[in-house]
Amino acid sequence: MPRKGLRPRDRRALPEADYKYDSVLVARFVNKINFEGKKATAEKIVADSMVIIADKTKEDAMTVFNRCIETVRPLLELKARRVGGATYQVPVEVKPLRSTSLAMCWLLDAARSRKGRPMAEKLAEEIILGSKKEGAAFKKREDTHRMAEANRAFAHFKW
């Protein structure tokens, strides 16, 4: 039996703006990189990669980072819906907070999959490529959109 009205949603607080770059986006990115509670290491990786980005592109690192997140953010994603014994991949729109989180995860996965260099260099390279609409993270976005387009026939199953 459904409840009357909607239940209040769990609202997780966003982190405070990063002290160095004064950006909530960077603070969230540091938290995504954070591994085994070593936040200082995560902050150092982000700071070093921002320096590398500024050196390589001759642009403001925050501008490149923001452009990268915007280009890698997905607009659609696939959700599995079970209807009558069959499972369909249904394309649904992605909420803004989730789309930025997905973009950050894809950037990190792409950087981690590169081998042989320090994490700051790999991350900087992936951010630069993402801002130019290239690289593995952008490819992941394009693949997701392509799959959503292919499964457009099942869009009427979203509820």
UniProtKB/Swiss-Prot annotation:
GO cellular component term of the entry, any: small ribosomal subunit
GO molecular function: rRNA binding; structural constituent of ribosome; tRNA binding
Domain of life: Bacteria
Keywords, sorted A to Z: Ribonucleoprotein, Ribosomal protein, RNA-binding, rRNA-binding, tRNA-binding
Annotated protein name in UniProt: Small ribosomal subunit protein uS7
Subunit field text: Part of the 30S ribosomal subunit. Contacts proteins S9 and S11.
Gene: rpsG
Gene Ontology terms describing biological process: translation
Role played: One of the primary rRNA binding proteins, it binds directly to 16S rRNA where it nucleates assembly of the head domain of the 30S subunit. Is located at the subunit interface close to the decoding center, probably blocks exit of the E-site tRNA.
Family: Belongs to the universal ribosomal protein uS7 family.
Naturally occurring in which organism (per UniProt): Elusimicrobium minutum (strain Pei191)
Alphabetized PANTHER family for the sequence: RIBOSOMAL PROTEIN S7 (PTHR11205)
InterPro entries: Ribosomal_uS7, Ribosomal_uS7_bac/org-type, Ribosomal_uS7_CS, Ribosomal_uS7_dom, Ribosomal_uS7_dom_sf
